A protein has these predicted regions:
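A conserved helix-loop-strand patch within extracytoplasmic ligand-binding domains
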Residues: 97-153
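A structural preference for short, hydrophobic beta-strand core positions in alpha/beta folds
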Residues: 53-55, 180
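Bacterial N-terminal signal peptides
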Residues: 3-14
Length: 202
């Protein structure tokens, strides 16, 4: 299993709810984030707040919107903040990562609330029949298949492809190389569709 530097998720806020008349809730452009944004919006609405929901934003755009005061709060992944927004690549435990991003983002006027128990970890998937036919059960098996030139094609979301703990470090860790022509970068939802439609192998 390939895990990112951290798997915790927490609400990152730039507003004091006690003093807010209207609260803008942001969300990224994939299903998990849209669900979290909707749940948060409904919860705050039930508490009597006037809520402006703005889900469907790209990760970097959403973060910038919060730093600029356009978004009050959204669910963020501590590993994403550590690596993408604070340029720290050292290996830390989930608790260490949470504490580090909490301190660093506080300097930018952002407050991390208590983390959820949810685990968000990247993984690679194949269609069951194709995996069985190829004898691929682990990332090591996948690396062997690539190195033996089985001609596998991949669909990756843009963030994982570009992350400093994403696609390239994964290839380095398992000692395999996939050419750019074998990798299609697309929105997260389209990744599943491409796999289901047998347009890609992984």
């Amino acid at each position: 299993t390939f895990t990112t530097a951290l798997t915790s998720i927490a609400l990152a806020s730039s507003v004091s709810l006690a003093n807010a008349n209207e609260i803008s809730v942001g969300g990224k452009n994939f299903t998990e984030q849209q669900i979290l944004a909707t749940m948060t919006t409904q919860y705050l609405d039930n508490l009597g707040y006037d809520v402006d929901s703005r889900s469907g934003m790209g990760s970097a755009i959403l973060r910038q919107a919060q730093e600029n005061g356009q978004i009050d709060l959204y669910w963020e992944y501590t590993g994403t903040s550590l690596i993408n927004y604070n340029d720290i690549s050292e290996s830390l435990s989930p608790e260490e990562t949470y504490q580090r991003v909490k301190e660093l983002d506080a300097e930018k006027g952002l407050t991390w609330l208590e983390p959820s128990e949810a685990n968000n970890t990247y993984a690679l998937a194949m269609r069951e029949a194709a995996a069985e036919e190829s004898g691929i059960e682990t990332l090591s098996d996948l690396a062997d298949a690539v190195n033996n030139e089985q001609g596998l094609t991949f669909a990756l979301n843009a963030e994982f492809y570009a992350r400093e703990d994403g696609w390239r470090p994964l290839m380095e860790a398992y000692d395999f190389r996939v050419g750019r022509s074998e990798v299609s970068r697309m929105d997260t939802g389209l990744v599943y569709q491409a796999l289901r439609n047998e347009e890609v192998d992984v």
